[in-house]
């Protein structure tokens, strides 16, 4: 799989599976935080931060949903890459419907933004990316953390007085997000990219066991973490909404 190695684009540098054939997801590399504190390293400010996404990506989708539900469209701008990722990686294709140019720097490829943030970066070029236009760098490329920042750091600029990480349910939200990540959110990829039959069987079994579990949970309560809509529901939704169209066939998640 394609990636940057010491800042150079390589098309043969990343194996998607480990020695046992199991899908091996690289951890997100940029993990700074935007905070409501004006004295923070990355203080929340309207118009300062920019979000790079692909509509094809469930991880990016969850940040877009949180941004929209909070009413942050005017506070955090967005650029949308081409959903078809070729050998050159995520590309800006403004001529394609639903895609945009890079509104910050006019880059041709998302990897150029990674190279700006770290000229010696080694790793995969992924979405979403939260960009600081003032410091000209990546703040964060971990979707769960970007969701949390949008929900907790930008209230001053949100047009909707809602939270998806409510007091009194935070432990339940964190537990639900952790519980669905490996078997469901990442599980569809573990099935689709498995390099051995054993790795595939393990992934698809855990996936459908988890779906059965959460169906039982939702038989007794309205949402995953209790009576209110939270980040956990958004995280589950972006996988489920793609299940029939993509994962059932393309990723072989078709046990049922």
Regions found by a protein language model. Give the residues of each.
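Generic internal hydrophobic packing segments that stabilize the cores of diverse globular domains
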Residues: 60, 64, 107, 111, ...
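GST-like fold's C-terminal all-alpha helical module
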Residues: 118, 122-125, 133, 138-256
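Local sequence-structure signature of Cys/Sec-based thiol-disulfide redox active-site neighborhoods
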Residues: 35-89, 227-231, 247, 251
């Amino acid at each position: 799989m394609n990636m940057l190695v010491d800042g150079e684009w390589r098309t043969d540098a990343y194996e998607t599976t480990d020695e046992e054939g199991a899908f091996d997801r690289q951890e997100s590399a940029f993990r700074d935080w935007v905070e409501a504190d004006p004295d923070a390293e990355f203080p929340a400010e309207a118009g300062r931060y920019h979000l790079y996404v692909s509509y094809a990506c469930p991880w990016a989708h969850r940040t877009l949903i949180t941004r929209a539900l909070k009413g942050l469209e005017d506070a955090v701008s967005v650029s949308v890459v081409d959903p078809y990722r070729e050998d050159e990686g995520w590309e800006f294709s403004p001529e394609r419907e639903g895609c945009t140019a890079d509104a910050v720097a006019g880059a041709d490829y998302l990897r150029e933004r990674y190279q700006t943030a770290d000229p010696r970066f080694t790793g995969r070029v992924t979405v979403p990316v939260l960009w600081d236009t003032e410091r000209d760098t990546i703040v964060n490329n971990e979707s769960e953390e970007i969701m949390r920042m949008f929900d907790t750091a930008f209230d001053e600029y949100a047009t909707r007085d809602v939270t998806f990480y409510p007091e009194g349910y935070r432990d339940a939200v964190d537990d639900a997000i952790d519980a669905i990540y490996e078997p469901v959110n990442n599980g569809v990829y573990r099935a689709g990219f498995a390099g051995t039959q054993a790795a595939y069987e393990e992934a698809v079994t855990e996936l459908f066991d988890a779906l059965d579990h959460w169906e039982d949970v939702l038989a007794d309560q309205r949402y995953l973490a209790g009576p209110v809509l939270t980040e956990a529901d958004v995280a589950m939704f972006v996988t489920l909404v793609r299940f029939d169209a993509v994962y059932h066939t393309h990723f072989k998640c078709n046990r049922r």
